[in-house]
UniProtKB/Swiss-Prot annotation:
Gene Ontology molecular-function annotations: carboxyl- or carbamoyltransferase activity; S-adenosyl-L-methionine binding
UniProt protein name: Carboxy-S-adenosyl-L-methionine synthase
BP-aspect Gene Ontology terms: tRNA wobble uridine modification
Disulfide bonds: none
Species, as recorded: Pseudomonas fluorescens (strain ATCC BAA-477 / NRRL B-23932 / Pf-5)
Protein family: Belongs to the class I-like SAM-binding methyltransferase superfamily. Cx-SAM synthase family.
Alphabetical list of SUPFAM superfamilies matching this protein: S-adenosyl-L-methionine-dependent methyltransferases (SSF53335)
PANTHER family for the chain: CARBOXY-S-ADENOSYL-L-METHIONINE SYNTHASE, TRANS-ACONITATE 2-METHYLTRANSFERASE-RELATED
Quaternary state and interactors: Homodimer.
Function: Catalyzes the conversion of S-adenosyl-L-methionine (SAM) to carboxy-S-adenosyl-L-methionine (Cx-SAM).
Amino acid sequence: MSKEPDRLFAQPLAQVPDFAFNEDVVRVFPDMIKRSVPGYPTIVENLGVLAAQFAQPNSVLYDLGSSLGAVTQALRRHVRTDGCRVIAVDNSAAMVERCREYLNGQDSMFQELLPVQVIEGDILALEFQPASVVALNFTLQFIAPEQRLALLGRIRQSLLPGGALILSEKLRFNDDQEHALLTDLHIAFKRANGYSELEIAQKRSAIENVMKPDSLEEHRERLLAAGFSKVVPWFQCLNFASLIALP
């Protein structure tokens, strides 16, 4: 993957545009997400491990909002269930193009990986096939809040008995003191990873209108309303968490 450092917000901008997954972001995305999301490598690799426990023969594994395909690669590293295939979906043409390049590279290094199809498209319009695993890895937070329940309901309808949705998200907290503390600790994490105060402030300004986090309680209530029977948090680092939702 690209080793280009994230310097997108290093210089003062007269007007900070809304964050978008364009070619500029794609170029630096691996560095950006590693330095911005505490626990990201652990979540991604273990998502593959978890998926291997739920994958069922002759079913689809979905990576929704696949970006550069890190989750898809983890699924292919860990899942060995007969007849499974991965469908990765993202609405950014730049992300999809680079994702395909990285997956071709994975194919050249390893044999007997799950077949994969990468689709450029809107996950809200996707016609789901019977699935045993669906991954939403830091994707739902970019979906309009009023559209989230319907999407989760459609995912629930597509899941086979014994399957799972694995949902990773940035969290907000209903307790003001808890929210302030974890926000400050997240900023400290970014400082420790080399981001300046200017970069942190401009990135926050760029993303606050396009990313709308929910609380853990909101996630749980929505997943149950969508028809899931059980919601199990399996990972949290600061204000980032991952959940398993069972049909």
